[in-house]
Amino acid sequence: DDDWVKATLLTSNGKDARKAKAEIRLKGDWADQLRDSHKLSFRIKVRNNDKIFGMSKFSIQAPKTRGNHNEPLFLDMMRMMDVIAPRYFFVDVRINDMKIGIMALEEHFNKILIESQGGREGPIIAIDEDWIWRQRHLNIIDGTSGLPYEYRDYPIKVFKAGKFSPGTIRTQHNMRAMSLLRDFMDGIVPANEVFDADKTSRWWIISNIWHAL
């Protein structure tokens, strides 16, 4: 997160053109996002409370890193079944007038994503996979395999947590969400006390359908 550089974004749909100030950095946890030096993966933040394609933060990556057309079709089905999912589509990219070609644009997790699909702003949490990627890199170096810890050992992260202020409603909601997920991972509370059973079942079914293809 310390590697951001300033940039200017120019977008066009063939009729109208837009310009916006932004910050950009390399992204990717795995070699497939950095292997092709011509199609590097980038995380992009639009500055000055502006938006591009209705988004304030998104990524671009080579389509093959996400299974080409599989990912947008998978996410489209999620939204059709009323499961919140990031917007994802293909764009023709140039960097400093150098033609990069078709890249996949993926919306980042924030309140704009939630509210654009009828949800209310609230905590967005996830299991932090940083340990997994670090261990996989070590496995490649050492010629080993597997992970030396269990699923319940992983830390939990909050997207855009902001400054920690104990008295604020936002901090209390973040802590409550993290506590519920941690209690589930530790086997203290059942899934139906943490997750929306109907939406979680739809997410599980769709994920298994597409990951089996």
Predicted features by range, described:
Residues D1:
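Mature N-terminal segment immediately following signal peptide/propeptide cleavage
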Residues W4-Y154:
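Conserved ATP-binding subdomain of kinase catalytic cores across diverse folds
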Residues N110-H211:
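ATP-dependent phospho-/nucleotidyl transfer catalytic cores
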Residues M77-V83, D186, I209-L213:
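Sec-exported extracytoplasmic/periplasmic mature domains
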